[in-house]
Amino acid sequence: MRKILYLIFFIFLIPINVSSENLLIQSTTSTRDSGLYKYLLPKYTYYNDIKIKVIAVGTGQAIKNAENCDGNILIVHDKGRELDFMSKGYGVKRHELMYNDYVLIGPSNDQDISKSKSITDAFSRIHDKKYKFVSRSDSSGTHSAELAVWRRLSLNPGTGSGKWYLESGQGMGPSLNIAVALNGYIFSDRSSWLRFKNKRNHKILYENKQELKNNYGMILVNHNRCSNLNYKYSLDLFNWLSSDEAANHIRKYRLNNQNVFYID
């Protein structure tokens, strides 16, 4: 009995709650699927001392999760929504982490879209010819970027929903599979396409790194709103990911002998 009481007493003397040592990154799926986290996070000094978990969902869902205090750090790619998150007090620090670009994927035997002079030209051709186009339609950063192109054309692809405009409601990988299976077109971030294995007869038909730049922002979630978050550990990881050391690692990360992300 005395041993049991001693054990209970000892447990209560432990100064730090184990759960407070766990860090949760709410992330867009494209960074997780690119393999970046498995490459980058183990290089963090305290990687073996703190359990770091990555939850990968669409940008919209990642932001909602962070608003609900379910995450220490947010890494997404929709600057408008990131700034809105900050303005509402959900975040305390924001850092432009890295960037890559979007590309338009389609059948290798395409004789039309590949001649496009701009992304709006490509989307206009798809709309006019009613080529099958797969949209993620999941409030992700990629989906938001796709919708922005349609808005620039003052077009509403939703009128063709279920006909030529196919809304998957899924992540990048499953959506790419659908586009390939249907011999259709799809707007994707480059890293997801590089890692995608079921390319079959599909390839990049339009690309322009400046026109289709895809910025990833990192936000430190406001610990004053979320008492469950350990600010010390969160800040340290945030600062390391913002450092020149981490930036150099990101620059060196490659898939299929190609750089995946870039630093401004």
Where are these regions (language model features)?
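Serine endopeptidase catalytic core focused on the charge-relay Asp
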Residues: 104
